[in-house]
Amino acid sequence: MRISTVDRRQQLIDAAIRVIRRDGVESASLRTIASEAKASLAAVHVCFTNKDELMQAAAAELLQQLVRSIPRVVDGSEDVRAIAHRVMDLFWAQMVSDELNILAQFEIGIWAKRNPHHGDLSRTVYSDYEKEISKLLVAAAKRQKQTIAARNVARALIVIMDGCSLQYFADPSDPRHKDLCDNLVDAYLDRVGL
């Protein structure tokens, strides 16, 4: 049975994510990804120009998996502070329940930074994440008749997430990480008057 290019492309992206989660970016050769997807190497080259393009698609998919879950946990009546905490709670819950997914995102970002011709990948991923969080913050601010610098608040939340997640990965058994994360969010929101 023939598989459409669109379906094959998604299979390869999903296979790339599985390989990266299991073995890391350095082990994610096109041959390994093709094998994981039960596809030929030729099929990979039909769908993607090179490994860089496939890694970019995998990074975008990982981001979308995280972003798609955000609106489902947001109540339409919450204020900016509550939304900020809900976003952080969601991220934290996903990180704790699926550490490999978050590690894969970090690893793809680091891989992109080490490959100069793909340095924009991390910028694109973070920008997309900022946009999605900003939409939620803007909606909450409008309900409260507030004006906020939503992109700045979203960026700050992402910075806090990244720092706290690195601390968590250094010692997952330390129970203080989540409290520290919540305190950092509150301190930032207090500082900017939210």
From Swiss-Prot:
Q: Which UniProt keywords apply?
A: DNA-binding, Plasmid, Repressor, Transcription, Transcription regulation
Molecular function (GO) terms for this protein are: DNA-binding transcription factor activity; transcription cis-regulatory region binding
What upregulates this protein?
Constitutively expressed.
Activity regulation:
6-hydroxy-D-nicotine and 6-hydroxy-L-nicotine prevent HdnoR from binding to the IR1 DNA. Both 6-hydroxy-nicotine enantiomers prevent DNA-protein complex formation at micromolar concentrations, with the D-enantiomer being twice as potent as the L-enantiomer. A thousand-fold higher L-nicotine concentration is required to elicit a similar effect.
Q: Which InterPro entries match?
A: Homeodomain-like_sf (IPR009057), HTH-type_TetR-like_transc_reg (IPR050109), HTH_TetR (IPR001647), Tet_transcr_reg_TetR-rel_C_sf (IPR036271)
* DNA-binding annotation, residue ranges on this chain: 29-48
Does the record carry Nucleotide-binding as a key word? Answer: no
Residue ranges crossing the lipid bilayer per the database entry: none
Family annotation (PROSITE patterns) = HTH_TETR_2
* HTH tetR-type domain boundaries: 6-66
Q: What does this protein do?
A: Represses expression of the 6-hydroxy-D-nicotine oxidase (6-hdno). Acts by binding to a gene operator site consisting of two inverted repeats, IR1 (covering the 6-hdno promoter region) and IR2 (situated upstream from the 6-hdno promoter). Binding to one site may stimulate binding of the protein to the second site.
Its assembly, as annotated, is: Homodimer.
The name under which this protein is listed is HTH-type nicotine-responsive transcriptional repressor HdnoR
Q: State the organism named in the record.
A: Paenarthrobacter nicotinovorans (Arthrobacter nicotinovorans)
Q: What is the lineage of its organism?
A: Bacteria, Bacillati, Actinomycetota, Actinomycetes, Micrococcales
